[in-house]
Amino acid sequence: RDRITARNIKQIHKFSGLLDFTFINYLKNIFIKNTKNRSKTNISKHYDLGNEFFSLWLDKTLTYSSAIFDEKNKDLSDAQNNKYQKLIDLIKPGTGDKVLEIGCGWGGFAEYLGKKYDVKLDCITISKKQFEYAKERIYRCGLNEKVNIQIKDYRDLKDKYNSIASIE
């Protein structure tokens, strides 16, 4: 380890000002409000890079968050489904329940929940690319009667829900 650190010492010194930069970002986030427009801009700059780009390195569910591996999970898709199920076990949706997913991404959780449980699911995103993909995905799965994908900011929600999920 010491040899690796010694070889990288020049690189380490390049980042010596990083702490100052991190503190400045912290202060910036305190004083710059996360408005609806700012949120939409930030999401668009990242998630609207193109679905093809994300499909190159995400699993087949296009889930963009950490998976949960256990002894049975052999690959990333299994581990993502394992995560979905653990979240469902936490929210315990009942038959006919109304469930909200905030930040639905490309619709992986919506598809999983919609196929396995008799619920009404509202899914929201502010990414145009994710919305288009998720809407088409749910339609292809025949779940459009149970799952409603919308472009909407969570601050604009008016409905009441039995459960709310948001995967980070």
Language model features: what each stretch is:
Residues 106-118:
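Conserved SAM-binding loop of SAM-dependent methyltransferases across substrates and taxa
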Residues 60, 64-65, 71, 75-96:
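Conserved alpha-helix/loop element of class I SAM-dependent methyltransferases that forms part
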Residues 141-154:
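Conserved SAM-binding strand-loop segment of SAM-dependent methyltransferases
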